Amino acid sequence: MLNEFINFETISRSDWQRFYQEDQVSLTPEELESIRSLNDKIDVQEVRDIYLPLINLIRIYHRAAEDLTFSKGIFLQKAQANRPFIIGISGSVAVGKSTTSRLLQLLLQRTFPKAKVDMVTTDGFLFPNQVLIDKGILNRKGFPESYDMPLLLNFLDTVKNGGDVNIPVYSHEIYDIVPGLTQKISQPNFLIVEGINVFQNPINQRLYMSDYFDFSIYIDADVKNIKTWYLERFQTLLELARKDENNYYHRFTKFTKEEALSLAQKTWKEINLVNLENYIEPTRNRAELILHKGDSHKIDLIHLKK
């Protein structure tokens, strides 16, 4: 059987944290709390040990991309326009992609004070619920066919080539695309694209999302841990929705604790686990970097593509 990680350099946490540089600016606990997702656990030590060395690595890739653009200009004998450095971040539901994305956005802004650093989630490219209903695939929400891939690829192409674009906004509170609300992306220096599908091959397409990425990260963890984190997040969402009748999750607050847990476990088994095993995890080795989380959400192993 082929070793999936044969093309990766495997690095322990203790070795990885040595790549931290003392002159880097860290974050305060308050800043971390402001970007942390619901049940994700991250502290200043994790930033120092894992994410500041990661910023150093991204700086290397960014510098190499700039050098390549400059060299192409010399070869073609014409100036090349600066293009945004795009970072793709993937992984399962509830694994902590959003926290990692927001943390990198903040650290990149600190590292490159004059740079514009934007972040988008591919949730905004899900078809609206009514379209999914019309297609008969509402129960497949989050699976590859539930995304408007031509729109997503057109967005990446436009941004990569210096254009401005307005994209849809998804709300987890209403569990749908927000009508009339858009996010404008206008010539960023860095763009972070986060979503479960960022490494997947679109059906009948000649372009792939990964064609536009300058760096890519997969957030990995054992399935049993991801399931635990998903169930914990579901309970947190119910608590937040208890007093908000407009929240999608409010309807489930009428359930008993046992009924709610049963629903969450059913959703995990029939949707999220199937999606992870069939569509998300198989794309893992397309990433440039794999960050593996242990039981406590701490990164315990790093795989860097050779």
From Swiss-Prot:
Which species does the entry assign this protein to? Streptococcus thermophilus (strain ATCC BAA-250 / LMG 18311)
Gene3D superfamilies linked: P-loop containing nucleotide triphosphate hydrolases
Q: What keywords are annotated for this sequence in UniProt?
A: ATP-binding, Coenzyme A biosynthesis, Cytoplasm, Kinase, Nucleotide-binding, Transferase
| Listed GO biological process terms | coenzyme A biosynthetic process
Q: Which cysteines are joined by disulfide bonds?
A: none
- EC number(s) from the headed UniProt entry: 2.7.1.33
Q: Which domain of life is it from?
A: Bacteria
| Gene Ontology MF annotations | ATP binding; pantothenate kinase activity
A Gene Ontology cellular-component term:
cytoplasm
Quote the subcellular location field of this record: Cytoplasm
UniProt-recorded name of the protein: Pantothenate kinase
